[in-house]
From Swiss-Prot:
Pfam families: ACT_6 (PF13740). This is UPF0237 protein SMU_72. It comes from Streptococcus mutans serotype c (strain ATCC 700610 / UA159). HAMAP family: UPF0237. Belongs to the UPF0237 family. Homodimer. InterPro entries: ACT-like_dom_sf, ACT_dom, UPF0237/GcvR_regulator, UPF0237_ACT. Residues 4-77 form the ACT domain.
Length: 88
């Protein structure tokens, strides 16, 4: 399983630490990650994978709820869907 996680919100200390910890807790591996701060806004994109099959609906709920605790918006989607949506 391969997926794309995006995180957007007002910048503050601990976002990367919190999100990467949650990723590990859910049994996902970070294959690639990038983040930047634009003005006062934090953005991050991570490519994650798992050898195990994952329930995307459950992962989405977990990340959405966790994002609320960090005051950021976290989205996860299958890399195949992400690629299809962003194919030029």
């Amino acid at each position: 399983m391969k997926a794309i996680i995006t995180v957007v919100g007002k910048d503050r200390t601990g976002i990367v630490a919190g999100v990467s910890t949650k990723i590990a807790e859910l049994g996902l591996n970070i294959d690639d990650i990038t983040q930047t701060v634009l003005d006062e806004y934090f953005t991050m994109m991570a490519v994650v994978s798992s050898q195990e099959s994952q329930d995307f609906a459950q992962l989405r709920k977990e990340f959405e709820a966790f994002g609320e605790t960090l005051n950021v918006k976290i989205n996860i989607q299958s890399s195949a869907i992400f690629d299809a949506m962003h194919n030029l």
